[in-house]
Amino acid sequence: MAHNEKDPSSVEPIKRKRFSNEYVRLFLAEFLGTFILIVFGCGTVAVTILSKHQSQDFFSVNVGFFLGIAFGVFIAGGVSGGHLNPAVTLAFAVINKCKWRKVPVYMAAQYLGAWVGSAILTAIYYDALHNHDQGNRTIETAGIYASYPQEFLTWQGGLADQIFATLLLMMGILALTDERNMVGPTGRAYVPLLVGLLVLAIGLAFGFNCGYPINPARDFGPRLFTAMAGWGTQVFSEPRGTYNWWWIPIIGPHVGAIIGALAYNFFIGYHWPKERDDVQLQSPSSPIVIVKNDAYQPLRPSRSVYSEELRITTS
């Protein structure tokens, strides 16, 4: 065999094991995207806490999650839509933008990706953790991974916080992925960054009470890891132990995302004109005019970040 000829059995062994099953591909994409979210976001929190706030501050933490979300969606978006959040997935299913049979696949991948991301982060910062607490795992270092409320916050206040913050998140996501709205099909490439900026805005405005988890996988996956990795059952309660906290960043975001999805459709989504024969879509900041016959059809075959059901594969 000539030296320039390649043996098919030795070329790209990983590629030869490619998965054609849609559910496997969705799982892998959501797993990796959520993993990226955790290592960037919680990694920024780790630097802040382990350096005793000398290296970074609260704003840096928000930027870390902004970048984690953006890169996570960039990575997973072309395959799964880049939900990275069980509450978002559930809300999409409620408004028929994600098939219900896919919801368990999305959620399993998201929770597992968050758990594995926490494990890798702990391995990277193991020496720094030990230097910080001498092996005495406390809620302070558990805060690297999951959210904990301020001492003054009641469970009712925490639940309201999570419902409202996730409501804003879901409305923003729907606005950014609605091709009839401002972003449109030509701005699709910017959606991951815009979703990251949306999370940044929520963090700056609503991060004081409990750190704005707004994502059950981002919160409970790492929380479960800490319970298994030496922090114990204290991670399921608020710092004083007066009530169980763990369920609030799970229930609140799910409820808030559903309300946000329904609210967006009620105020915006259901009211686009169906017939566009004599209606022009024009950006206020652009002289370009696009004339369409049906506002409910994409301007061209395209992929929509986040909304799995809106994705159309080009050929």
From Swiss-Prot:
Glycosylation site residues: 136
Motif NPA 2, residue numbers: 215-217
Motif segment (NPA 1): 85-87
Up-regulation conditions: Transcript abundance is medium and expression levels are not significantly affected by desiccation or rehydratation.
CDD domains reported in the protein's UniProt record: MIP
Record keywords, A-Z: Cell membrane, Glycoprotein, Membrane, Repeat, Stress response, Transmembrane, Transmembrane helix, Transport
Subcellular location, record wording: Cell membrane
Gene Ontology terms: cellular component: basolateral plasma membrane
Gene Ontology molecular function: glycerol channel activity; urea transmembrane transporter activity; water channel activity
Regions that span the bilayer: 31-51, 58-78, 105-125, 157-177, 189-209, 248-268
Membrane topology type: Multi-pass membrane protein
InterPro entries: Aquaporin-like (IPR023271), MIP (IPR000425), MIP/Aquaporin (IPR050363), MIP_CS (IPR022357)
Entry keyword annotation includes Protease: no
Swiss-Prot/TrEMBL domain comment: Aquaporins contain two tandem repeats each containing three membrane-spanning domains and a pore-forming loop with the signature motif Asn-Pro-Ala (NPA).
Function, as annotated: Aquaglyceroporin that may modulate the water content and osmolytes during anhydrobiosis.
Family assignment from sequence similarity: Belongs to the MIP/aquaporin (TC 1.A.8) family.
Protein known as: Aquaporin-7
Native source species: Milnesium tardigradum
